[in-house]
């Protein structure tokens, strides 16, 4: 059974991978930051690849669950999309380093792309399927305008991701302090939802 000290240190382990990426994250540094011995880390995870796999799978599962959990047939479709867009935005706000992590580890690294893209694709596909059925029904009921599910979800993902990827540029270009930036991000959440609504409303 995994020791309590290691379980309690897993957030440190995740942060190290998100900060450094796979190639630059050293298991000795991970163990030191997590407050465990290198031998203990190796005993529970065997290899850096296994540790990375655990971190990646956990983040993908968490994101997928947070999105699917917003879908409820008892709510109007627009409300479901408001909740889904907001949940995705909040997930990135809680994991702001994740977009860069995915870019580095999947888009720029062919080996890890082959290993982990299917995991990410499976989670995205599951969300798409859940949204697609509800979207088709909403269009038939005349609630929303027709749109391909892939286009809708890509718009949601790209709007939300760019709100965080572009933070440094926005902060410098508009000379925003920390509080201004916090307010800007809060406003982006509402703006992103409104932009999705503007495409769906009849």
Give the residues covered by each predicted segment.
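Active-site loops and adjacent core secondary-structure elements that bind or stabilize anionic groups
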Residues: 11-12
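Amphipathic alpha-helical linker/stalk segments
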Residues: 55-83, 121
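Short secondary-structure transition hinges
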Residues: 83, 90-130, 151, 178-183
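Single conserved hydrophobic/aromatic residue that forms the stacking wall/gate
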Residues: 1-8
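C-terminal peripheral helix-coil segments that are non-catalytic and often amphipathic
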Residues: 87-90, 94, 125-141, 145, ...
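Helix-turn-helix
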Residues: 3, 16-50, 54-55
């Amino acid at each position: 059974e995994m020791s309590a000290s290691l379980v309690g240190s897993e957030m440190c382990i995740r942060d190290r991978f998100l900060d450094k990426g796979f190639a630059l994250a050293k298991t000795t540094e991970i163990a030191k930051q997590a407050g465990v011995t290198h031998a203990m880390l190796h005993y529970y995870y065997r290899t850096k690849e296994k540790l990375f796999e655990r971190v990646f799978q956990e983040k993908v599962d968490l994101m997928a669950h947070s999105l699917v959990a917003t879908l409820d047939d008892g709510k109007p479709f627009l409300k479901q999309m408001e909740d889904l867009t907001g949940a995705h935005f909040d997930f990135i706000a809680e994991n702001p380093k994740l977009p860069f992590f995915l870019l580095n580890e999947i888009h720029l690294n062919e080996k890890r792309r082959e290993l982990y893209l299917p995991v990410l694709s499976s989670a995205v596909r599951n969300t798409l399927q859940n949204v697609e059925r509800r979207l088709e029904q909403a269009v038939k009921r005349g609630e929303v305008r027709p749109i391909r599910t892939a286009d809708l979800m890509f718009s949601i993902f790209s709007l939300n991701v760019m709100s965080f990827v572009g933070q440094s540029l926005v902060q410098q270009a508009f000379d925003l302090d920390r509080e201004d930036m916090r307010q800007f991000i809060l406003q982006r959440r509402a703006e992103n939802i409104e932009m999705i609504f503007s495409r769906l409303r009849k």
